[in-house]
Amino acid sequence: MSTINSDTSEAMPHISVNAQYIKDLSLENPSAPSSLAALDQRPQIDLSLDINITNLSDENFYEVELNIEAIARNEKYKLFQIELKYAGVFNLINIDSEQHPILLSVHCPAMIFPFARKIIASCTQDAGFQPLMIDPIDFGALYHKKMSEHQN
């Protein structure tokens, strides 16, 4: 049996997830039940994603919030609109503050995204549609794009 030296493990840099939660969830199914009969073709999905980061204290606690909105349409109807604000509280332990922006913008959103994706898939399925399976998101590419836009 191996033992872990607690003094060493506490000095190791790591991210602690203290909580994950739905802040806001809305699903509109405005054309039901007519829209449910018109599912013979794949709908067009318009997806938007935003990340909000809030410093909760001086002790490196942060809330990272994913704001995801998806609107599904076909030729006749707006099939559904779903909006989800899903957040996590993260504690960045023994991590240099210069690394905080990339961790909070890339790694933390990537940790909670699968849970938000599952909620959206379940809600759209419960609304009578095929579950909306959002493709994986490259948060690193989004971060670098945002940083290059700020530099210009």
UniProtKB/Swiss-Prot annotation:
The keyword Chaperone applies. It is found in: Cytoplasm. Gene3D superfamilies: SecB-like. GO terms for biological process: protein folding; protein tetramerization; protein transport. This is Protein-export protein SecB. Belongs to the SecB family. Pfam families: SecB. The gene is secB. SUPFAM superfamilies: SecB-like. GO terms for cellular component: cytoplasm. The keyword rRNA-binding does not apply. NCBIfam families: PRK05751.1-3, secB. GO terms for molecular function: unfolded protein binding. Keywords: Chaperone, Cytoplasm, Protein transport, Translocation, Transport. One of the proteins required for the normal export of preproteins out of the cell cytoplasm. It is a molecular chaperone that binds to a subset of precursor proteins, maintaining them in a translocation-competent state. It also specifically binds to its receptor SecA. InterPro entries: SecB, SecB-like_sf. It comes from the Bacteria. Homotetramer, a dimer of dimers. One homotetramer interacts with 1 SecA dimer.
